[in-house]
């Protein structure tokens, strides 16, 4: 047996490589951890017999955590498994909540029929970020968990296509970056340029993107290319606290901060010509725009409000208090579900208002109408949400509440819940990379419905804490590297650029290729950035 001190003396070479690529949160005094070999990797000895390696999966066996209702799993190739083994060492030596443990913990919740994590997963609040957890609703104890959705409710991504080519905007790139940065407020606490009344804000929470269409800020056809057509039913604004409303009503059309961004991109490679054509993307060099943001202060406050309510109720006593929840059909469960839907509708409208500003900015700089530039929405997807869906459980159709936290719905061809335009190819899943790297568009598969509740990854996935990124990297170097790559970067606080550096994230290509190898989604095309707007 080997003994591991995770920062210096690991004997497993693969673990050492993971160690170089992954960075912990606050370090605590080290403890020696005895390790054993697992398929060529060093894992803590206490986990002996707790895992099974399958193609593109790490199966976490029932019993890894007491009270698990079944096995759990993480989709990963060998390189991504390296990172997980390092987290396991930290879990034991530092009491660090690893993604593996969090995925297993979620499998203990009442009513759960599946707990899994995507290749981009990393530890988060209670649930891993990249986690998918489904509970069967014919179990009266099945819970809904605010922490299983996260603080940025309906954080999501949308992609807008154009008929422009790279050469059409190359000479206007700097001015276009400036105009987008001016038109779209970004950064912590920023407010929108268009202020809505409290009454209108309630309408936005009920109607989502429909409100923008009715008031001339979005196109009718945008609705058909948005998950849930941009409006989730059962959204009652009276269940959203005044403090949450006060944080959100001036933020419709704002980007926010952290890993949220707007990118002007070009199509770099098309892997599935027919699927790309269905999306209106036909040429290498075609210009697209990607937007990644969510429900801003509104979603954060709603999540906190209902976490507090769930904890006070004492109904659910999970193995980790951050997993707190209540039965879905209980009064608090239904109140949270409705308030969450209000935030989701706000987020659809937020991305819709940003799109309105993008279209204006392109018109200002290029002196063409947005319709002439074919600035149509390809798709808008959520990746922090809980939804009622029908899935096969034990060979029966069962209604489930599916929590996706840092995971994208990716339904297969012919699924009734996707747009008619995409019935033949499957639901598009928009996957953003890290700052300065490529992004991808995927589509769902039939196998994904069986393996992952119709879910795939949502991005690259953080491997380095923000604090550690700032310690190890310099923002000046990150900004200079973007310039050398020919990328126009506009960022509200340049001192924080290192937080979002490429080195702080996993390789998005490796992530999406793992999803494809696991057959839970299929790669359609790749994009690379020309302009990056950050909060």
UniProtKB/Swiss-Prot annotation:
Gene Ontology biological process terms, A to Z = tRNA splicing, via endonucleolytic cleavage and ligation
Instruction: Report residues binding Mn(2+) 1.
Output: 152, 155, 260
Per the UniProt entry, the Enzyme Commission number(s) are 6.5.1.8
- Gene3D superfamilies per UniProt: tRNA-splicing ligase RtcB
GO MF terms here are:
GTP binding; metal ion binding; RNA ligase (GTP) activity
> What are the alphabetically sorted keywords of the record?
GTP-binding, Ligase, Manganese, Metal-binding, Nucleotide-binding, tRNA processing
Q: Which reaction does it catalyse?
A: a 3'-end 3'-phospho-ribonucleotide-RNA + a 5'-end dephospho-ribonucleoside-RNA + GTP = a ribonucleotidyl-ribonucleotide-RNA + GMP + diphosphate; a 3'-end 2',3'-cyclophospho-ribonucleotide-RNA + a 5'-end dephospho-ribonucleoside-RNA + GTP + H2O = a ribonucleotidyl-ribonucleotide-RNA + GMP + diphosphate + H(+)
**Positions annotated to bind GMP:** 259-263, 383-384, 432-435, 439, 458-461, 534
As to how many cofactors bind and how, the note says: Binds 2 manganese ions per subunit.
Which residue ranges does the record annotate as region Disordered? 1-31
Active site, per annotation: 458
Q: Which cofactor does it need?
A: Mn(2+)
Basic residues bias located where?
1-16
Q: Which Pfam families match?
A: RtcB
- Is Metal-binding a UniProt keyword of this protein? yes
* Complex and partners: Catalytic component of the tRNA-splicing ligase complex.
Query: What exactly does this protein do?
Result: Catalytic subunit of the tRNA-splicing ligase complex that acts by directly joining spliced tRNA halves to mature-sized tRNAs by incorporating the precursor-derived splice junction phosphate into the mature tRNA as a canonical 3',5'-phosphodiester. May act as an RNA ligase with broad substrate specificity, and may function toward other RNAs.
The family note in this entry says: Belongs to the RtcB family.
Family matches, as PANTHER family: RNA-SPLICING LIGASE RTCB HOMOLOG
Under which name does UniProt file this protein? Answer: RNA-splicing ligase RtcB homolog 2
């Amino acid at each position: 047996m080997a003994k591991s001190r995770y920062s210096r003396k690991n004997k497993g070479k693969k673990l050492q490589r993971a160690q170089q690529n992954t960075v912990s949160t606050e370090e605590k005094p080290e403890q020696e951890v005895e390790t054993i070999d697992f398929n060529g990797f060093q894992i803590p000895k206490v986990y002996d017999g707790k895992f099974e390696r399958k193609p593109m999966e790490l199966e976490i066996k029932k019993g890894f955590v007491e009270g698990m209702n079944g096995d759990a799993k993480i989709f990963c190739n060998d390189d991504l498994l390296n990172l997980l083994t390092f987290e396991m060492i930290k879990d034991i030596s530092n009491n660090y909540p690893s993604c593996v443990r969090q995925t297993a913990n979620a499998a203990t919740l009442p009513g759960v029929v599946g707990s899994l994590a995507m290749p981009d997963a990393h530890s988060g609040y209670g649930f891993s970020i990249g986690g998918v957890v489904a509970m069967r609703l014919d179990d009266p104890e099945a819970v809904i968990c605010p922490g299983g959705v996260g603080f940025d409710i309906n954080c999501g991504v949308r992609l807008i296509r154009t008929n422009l080519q790279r050469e059409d905007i190359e000479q206007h790139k700097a001015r276009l970056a400036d105009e987008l940065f001016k038109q779209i407020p970004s950064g912590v606490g920023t407010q929108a340029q268009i202020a809505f009344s409290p009454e209108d804000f309630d309408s936005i929470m009920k109607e989502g993107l429909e409100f923008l269409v009715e008031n001339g800020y979005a196109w009718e056809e945008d609705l058909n290319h948005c998950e849930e057509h941009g409006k989730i039913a059962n959204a009652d604004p009276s269940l959203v606290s005044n403090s949450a409303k006060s944080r959100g009503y001036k933020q419709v059309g704002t980007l926010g901060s952290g890993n949220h961004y707007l990118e002007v991109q070009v199509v770099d490679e098309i892997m599935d010509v027919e699927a790309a054509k269905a999306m209106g993307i036909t040429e290498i060099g075609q210009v697209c725009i990607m937007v990644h943001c969510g429900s801003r202060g509104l979603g954060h406050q709603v999540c906190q409000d209902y976490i507090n309510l769930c904890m006070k109720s004492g109904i659910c006593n999970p193995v980790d208090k951050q997993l707190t929840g209540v039965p879905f059909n209980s009064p608090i469960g239904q109140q949270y579900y409705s308030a969450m839907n209000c935030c989701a509708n706000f987020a659809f409208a937020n991305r819709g208002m940003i799109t309105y500003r993008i279209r204006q900015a392109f018109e200002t700089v290029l002196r063409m109408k947005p319709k002439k530039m074919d600035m149509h929405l390809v798709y808008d997807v959520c990746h922090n949400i809980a939804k009622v869906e029908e899935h096969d459980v034990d060979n029966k159709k069962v209604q489930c509440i599916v929590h996706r936290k840092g995971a994208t719905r990716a339904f297969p061809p012919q699924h009734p819940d996707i747009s008619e335009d995409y019935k033949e190819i499957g639901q598009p899943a928009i996957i953003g990379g890290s700052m300065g790297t490529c992004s991808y568009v995927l589509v769902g598969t039939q196998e994904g419905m069986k393996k992952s509740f119709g879910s795939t990854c949502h991005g690259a996935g953080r491997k380095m804490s923000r604090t550690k990124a700032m310690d190890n990297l310099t923002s000046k170097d990150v900004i200079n590297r973007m310039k050398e790559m020919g990328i126009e970067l506009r960022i509200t606080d340049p001192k924080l650029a290192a937080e979002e550096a490429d080195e702080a994230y996993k390789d998005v290509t490796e992530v999406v290729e793992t999803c494809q190898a696991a057959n839970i989604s299929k790669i359609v095309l790749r994009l690379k950035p020309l302009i990056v707007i950050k909060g």
